[in-house]
A protein has these predicted regions:
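Cytosolic regulatory regions of ion transport systems
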Residues: 1-221
Length: 221
């Protein structure tokens, strides 16, 4: 189970509401803030600490306990002035990690300049994931974990079946690290190097962000 932390969400549009619900479902503490009472009322059904306030008011944020949050999320990417103010206020209050939603790359870079530790551009990110999936039907899920590496869940490649990690030597040849295998509804962690891949396995691995370009090579091993 994930460590319990406190997240403050500034902006309760569809993205903010969904995020608040998911974090609450994962037993995390959420402070949900928006100046629109209608949106606050929507999340108050599942978030105990849902507040109607203008988050450009740093004193009001401090009084709401925002300074004790572990992570802040600013979701108002289409309203740049509000997003900038939200990021700056969270940082000034000492929130250690601030994530901001942006509607384009230019806005994302600006939010990073004013203090956001990470930005997300949902439409752009979705398009990238879609393109990767179209290039290789073997990729089930792919999430960037940093600027260089991704976490992937893939269908076991046909040429891997009947072979083990020692034989495939994925780490040395392709810098691919297998961290788990899902088989028959069970998840195998700390995979033994002698464990042979079986048909219908789903493999969890960490690799470079451009690994999808090399799937044809991986399937020829």
């Amino acid at each position: 189970m994930a460590e319990r932390k406190t997240y403050v969400i500034l902006g309760l549009g569809r993205f903010g509401q969904t995020l608040a619900k998911q974090l609450t479902d994962f037993n995390q503490d959420v402070i949900a803030i928006d100046k629109d009472m209608a949106d606050v009322e929507k999340v108050s059904a599942f978030v105990a600490n849902a507040l109607c306030m203008d988050y450009s008011d740093i004193d009001a944020l401090a009084a709401a306990g925002v300074k004790d949050a572990d992570t802040g999320i600013v979701t108002t990417g289409t309203m740049l002035d509000q997003a900038i103010q939200g990021v700056m206020n969270l940082k000034e209050l000492g929130v250690p990690y601030v994530l901001a939603k942006a509607n384009n790359i230019k806005t994302a870079r600006l939010l990073e300049k004013v203090g956001a530790d990470k930005t997300i551009t949902p439409e752009n990110d979705m398009a990238v994931r879609c393109a990767r999936a179209l290039i290789s039907n073997d990729i089930l899920e792919m999430v960037d974990v940093d600027a260089e590496n991704s976490l992937l869940k893939i269908k076991v490649l046909s040429n891997w079946v009947g072979h083990n990690l020692k034989q495939l030597d994925l780490r040395t040849k392709y810098s691919v690290n297998v961290i788990g295998i899902e088989r028959d509804g069970k998840f195998i962690v700390n995979v033994n190097p002698d464990e042979e891949f079986k048909e219908n396995d789903e493999v969890l691995l960490v690799a470079s962000n451009d690994i999808y370009k090399h799937f044809s090579e991986l399937n020829k091993i």
